[in-house]
């Protein structure tokens, strides 16, 4: 049986981490693509040389030509420029949109059957543009955001309650930006919803609000500490979880940026929602009930994403 082929577009910090994780999990053979000559080849060789120590079998190929991604089962896109301190994800729009146009053309030509996971920021606008540029069906193109945002929320909650991260579930909806909507009501510790834990005296509403805000600022906090780049371990782990659910048809319920066709009152836009990811890509979009306040927050988040998509059309009218 032929191994799966995983193509990584962009061989920076996230790309290298993705390649290593794909190897460790034996998800398939890996092609690292980058426009910088030597970078994907060097990282691929370095990771391949770790395989005898870690005990995994996979081929790693570095490439500077899109032809190398031909026939990929999964394509994960990290190409583009990362944030620097003081920048919002939205500041990257113009530069990274041009990158998405090139990446989309490469995928369209060489990997039209692939399941595509976009990580490039500003995420919701970039995955929307990438789907249009590539011409792939919407259920085969997603943005990695909600898994990461939920993971941050879960980690902060596990710290607050001094419990295992495995017993914390968390729910984050909306765009991958300052307007994301972490939902306390749908987040639990061992099945107990957060509002009940407040009543039980485990935490206070004020502390919970601070954790929710820290989740929104999670990426910026790391950018501020690193000063020369942005997060890469957690984003890579999150994208690999989505890829694994697709490749193994696990049907995991995962929050990703998916194209909506009327759910939550949104059409033809990519927004973070809970989905079922299996062998057909996005197999189901789960529409949960939102109260008035949550709906208002979600609508505000959607409006922010819509503004970015409009800005994209201003730069690249072909996206209309």
UniProtKB/Swiss-Prot annotation:
The keyword Lyase does not apply. Substrate binds at residues 83, 89, 121, 152. GO terms for molecular function: L-lactate dehydrogenase activity; L-malate dehydrogenase (NAD+) activity. Its EC number is 1.1.1.37. InterPro entries: L-lactate/malate_DH, Lactate/malate_DH_C, Lactate/malate_DH_N, Lactate_DH/Glyco_Ohase_4_C, Malate_DH_type3, NAD(P)-bd_dom_sf. It catalyses: (S)-malate + NAD(+) = oxaloacetate + NADH + H(+). The keyword Plastid does not apply. It is an enzyme of class 1 (oxidoreductase). One of its GO terms (biological process) is tricarboxylic acid cycle. NAD(+) binds at residues 10-15, 34, 96, 119-121. It holds the Pfam family Ldh_1_C. Belongs to the LDH/MDH superfamily. MDH type 3 family. Catalyzes the reversible oxidation of malate to oxaloacetate. This is Malate dehydrogenase. It comes from Brucella canis (strain ATCC 23365 / NCTC 10854 / RM-666). The gene is mdh.
């Amino acid at each position: 049986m032929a191994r799966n082929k995983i193509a990584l577009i962009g061989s920076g910090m996230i790309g290298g981490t993705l390649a290593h994780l794909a190897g460790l999990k034996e998800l398939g053979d890996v092609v690292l693509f980058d426009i910088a000559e030597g970078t994907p080849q060097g990282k691929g060789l370095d990771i391949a040389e770790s395989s005898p120590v870690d005990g995994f079998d996979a081929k790693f190929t570095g490439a500077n030509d899109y032809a190398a991604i031909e026939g990929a089962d999964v394509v994960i896109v990290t190409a583009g420029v990362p944030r620097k301190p003081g920048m919002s994800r939205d500041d990257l729009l113009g530069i990274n949109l041009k990158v998405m146009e090139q990446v989309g053309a490469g995928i369209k030509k060489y990997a039209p059957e692939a399941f595509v996971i976009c990580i490039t920021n500003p995420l919701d606008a970039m995955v929307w543009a990438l789907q249009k540029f590539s011409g792939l069906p919407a259920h085969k193109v997603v943005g990695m955001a909600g898994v990461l945002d939920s993971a941050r929320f879960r980690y902060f909650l596990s710290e607050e309650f001094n419990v295992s991260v495995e017993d914390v579930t968390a729910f984050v909806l909306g765009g991958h930006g300052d307007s994301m909507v972490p939902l306390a009501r749908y987040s639990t510790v061992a099945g107990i919803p957060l509002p009940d834990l407040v009543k039980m005296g485990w935490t206070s509403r004020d502390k919970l609000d601070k954790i929710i805000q820290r989740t929104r600022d999670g990426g910026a906090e790391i950018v501020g500490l690193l000063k020369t780049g942005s997060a890469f371990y957690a984003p890579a782990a999150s994208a690999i979880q989505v890829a694994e659910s697709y490749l193994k048809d696990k049907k995991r319920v995962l929050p990703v940026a998916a194209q909506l066709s009327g759910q939550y009152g949104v059409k033809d836009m990519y927004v973070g929602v809970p989905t079922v990811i299996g062998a057909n890509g996005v197999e189901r979009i789960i529409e949960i009930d939102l109260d008035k306040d949550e709906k208002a927050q979600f609508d505000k988040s959607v409006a922010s994403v819509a503004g970015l998509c409009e800005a994209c059309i201003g730069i690249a009218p072909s996206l209309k």
